[in-house]
Amino acid sequence: MNNGVRKKVTLAGLLVSIGIVYGDIGTSPLYVMKAIVNENGGIASVNREYIVGSISLILWTITLLTTVKYVLIALKATNHGEGGIFSLYALVRKKAKWLVLPALIGGAALLADGTLTPAVTVTTAIEGLKNMRFGNDIPVPNQNSVLIITIIILLFLFSIQRMGTSIIGKTFGPIMLIWFTFLGLTGAMNLSHDLSLLEALNPVLAVKILFSPANKVGVLILGAVFLATTGAEALYSDVGHVGKGNIMASWPYVFICLALNYLGQGVWILENPNYHAGNTDFNPFFEALPSQWKFFAIILATLAAIIASQALITGSFTLVSEASGLKFLPRMKIIYPSTEQGQIFIPSINKMLCAATIGIVFLFKTSEHMEAAYGLAITVTMLMTTILLFEYLSLKKVNILLRLVFLFLFGAIESMFLISSLAKFLHGGYVTVIIAAFIGAIMYIWYFGNKVRDRREAKNAYVRLDEYTSMLSNLSHDDSVPLYATNLVYMAKVKYNKFIKRDILYSILDKRPKRAHAYWFVTVNVTNEPFTAEYAINTYGTKNVINVQLYLGFKQQQKVNVYLRQIVHELIKDGTIESQPQEYTTTPGRDVGDFKFVIVNDVISPQTQLNTYEKWLVESRVWLQNLSSNPAVWFGLEYADTVVERVPLILGSQNIKSIQRTKLK
């Protein structure tokens, strides 16, 4: 990422940030007050003390969690411009090994909760159309119609992700600016009827309502209040797409508009205590609007809901990309729609998110049921982020007293939200817990499986390539061995320009000697620039053993066979390697022979000596690798002559009992 560009605050940058970052938190007014009223038994069961106290809780929750923790503190904890819990972990992981656990737990929970955000926001917006009359027609007469429209919108949203966040942000930015202005305007109109509700700005009222008889659910009200700030973690994850400067500059306007709308809804509820009493479809957000504005509000809310979903999707792409880099997840195919490295698209994750979100819509069917499940997992993520931020502040030499205040203040607040949200478990929260556990299990297996493998791998797993060049050259010129290929290419990482896995040489020399005119060992290095296409070589003083280091930009297609053919032509032309004239060819004067690419996969050897737990970890990790990735596609070799070989992976000390010779019996 070009950090210099990203730090600049521009009008265009502000617009894009509003379009990408604030969708989730910006659509909370659609359902937060509805959830708070329903928690207490409906509009007929609430009074002024309850409404004022609840709004005070909302405003101070947003102030403390979103403004102070995320905008003022967390946005400073970026890693090369990228944010999110994994980026934060990358900054502090050297401080203590155990910090990997909050990173794994928090990341898995955030990805799981992201499946609910698109479902609940879009469904809530479309429910505003239910039973609305247009002339003599009612286009959306029931909940089934709502579900159909919701699913169509979600399918459209996931289908446009390939365009990239820059294009989407430029489209969504103006819409979200209109949305927040609309929230502020309508809220101010209702608030003007009773300015005394501004007493909700007093934090004492927020504390009092937790223990007031007017609040029938006690501290469990925090489960509904927390919905107002679920988008804070997504805000942090999306900083790589728009830059922290643009977020910090645009947040005050967004916060003011949100506050005005919550206050305005509160005034309307108090003015209409018997309105729609007992109606389960009641939503104060839409009811508080003038009737002639409702259709426009529903259309605008639907667009805002789509953008809310976008914030979670782009954040999920960033999280998964970072998780792969930290070896929490297998490597996945990443597409860069723009020249900014922070803007990515991961097709496999997009498909899984789409399937999970639509599945949740079918499972819960109504926004009320979704709200009951929403927010549980994200409280876990926020708590884990607090732990990692505490370590980050320590890394930055912040005064120990201030660090402890931060840890205990936000730890206590988020623990209360977590406890209150646990009440949601049986009402649907179990769904996100199951999804989070599944994602967390994959991360755990991949990370700790790699750790076991690296720790228990034989000390001689890597050998010096330059010590085998003589043997390879002799094999190349040994006419008694049949020719396997003119150019034999191994996709194998050569470390420090000389160390290579013994498996590679085992494949060439031990299984059945593979004779070739030239042996190529290719390492692909992805650079931070978008369109780099460079290479460097080391022949170790030979004409037929070549270590090729490819340096490809993150947007550059990894068509290794195309690049290698060009490299061979250049090396033959300058005499670095020998010419490869072809006697039989359709191309006169052709001086480059055939290519055979070899990809080596590991399989656990029966000789591996590990305890049951470690063996399960490594076997599961190898299984995940074979399931999740296709190296031939990754390196652009799907149409090349490619061989995938399996070689035994022997881990741990080998205690093989020797066999004794005896006489025939």
Swiss-Prot record:
TM annotation in the entry: 13-33, 55-75, 98-118, 138-158, 167-187, 195-215, 217-237, 250-270, 295-315, 344-364, 375-395, 400-420, 428-448
Recorded catalytic activity of this chain's protein: K(+)(in) + H(+)(in) = K(+)(out) + H(+)(out)
GO cellular component, one term: plasma membrane
Record flagged with keyword Cell membrane: yes
Location in or out of the cell: Cell membrane
Alphabetical keyword list: Cell membrane, Ion transport, Membrane, Potassium, Potassium transport, Symport, Transmembrane, Transmembrane helix, Transport
GO MF annotations in UniProt: potassium ion transmembrane transporter activity; symporter activity
Coiled-coil segments: none
Superkingdom: Bacteria
Bridged cysteine pairs (disulfide): none
Record membrane topology: Multi-pass membrane protein
HAMAP family in alphabetical order: Kup
Family indicated by similarity: Belongs to the HAK/KUP transporter (TC 2.A.72) family.
Name of the protein this chain belongs to: Probable potassium transport system protein Kup 2
Organism: Lactobacillus johnsonii (strain CNCM I-12250 / La1 / NCC 533)
Taxonomic classification: Bacteria, Bacillati, Bacillota, Bacilli, Lactobacillales
Name of the encoding gene: kup2
